[in-house]
Amino acid sequence: YMNYANKNFPNGVKSELGDIIAYHNDTTVDWLGFYGQGNYTSGALNAYGMLGTSSIKYSYQDHFTVANEKITSPSISAMQVKGGVMYDVNENISVFGNLGLVEKPPIMDNVIYFDGTVASDPANEKFQSMEFGMNYNTAKYAVKASYYNTQWMDRNLTKSVTTGQGSSGDTDVIFLTGVDQSHTGFELEGSAQVIDMLRLDFAASFGTWQFVDDASGNYQ
C-alpha cells in the first residue's frame, strides 16, 4: 500500500502487511457505579424508587505524535433519582405518575477530542422528567393516555471549524455548553380484541420538541 497523503513524503510511504497506517490511538474508559431500588405495595397502591451514582474517567494516547503522551481526563461524577406511583381506582382504571432526575456524563468525544484537545470544564447532561397518565383495561379493550414533560439541559456537543485562527493554525474545536431542549407532549395508545384471532392496535403522539435559551461555545 502506497500512501501519498503526507506532503512531507512526495514519493509516498510504502506500508506492508502488519504496518500501522492512518491512526494509532489507545483509549480507555474507567467506570464505577452503584445503585439501589425499592418497591412498596399496599392494597391499590404501588410505588417504587431508585437512587444511583457513578464516576467515569477517560484516557487517550496518540502513538503517532512525537510526545506519545497519555492524556487523562479528571473523574466525572453523576447521579440519578427516579420514582413513581400507581393507584388502582377500580378494577378497570388506574392512574400513575413518574418523576426523574438523571445526570449523564459526557461521552469521550465531548471530553477528549480526536486531536487530543481536552475540554476545560465538561458538564453533565441533565434530564428532569415527569409523566402522568391513566390506564383503562377491560376484557376486550385497553387504553393508555399520558402527558410527559422532559427538560434536557447542558447537552454536550462539539463542532470543528476552519478559521485560520487559534493554536491549531487552521482548525479549532468548539465545545458547546448550555444547549437546552424542552420535550413535552401527549401520548395515546390502545388495543381492541375484536375476535379471538384478531386484535387491533393504535397509537398516537403529539409533542413539542424544541431548543430553548442561547448556547455558548469555548475555543480549545
Which residue stretches match the model-derived regions?
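Signature of Gram-negative outer-membrane beta-barrel scaffolds
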Residues: 1-90, 112, 216
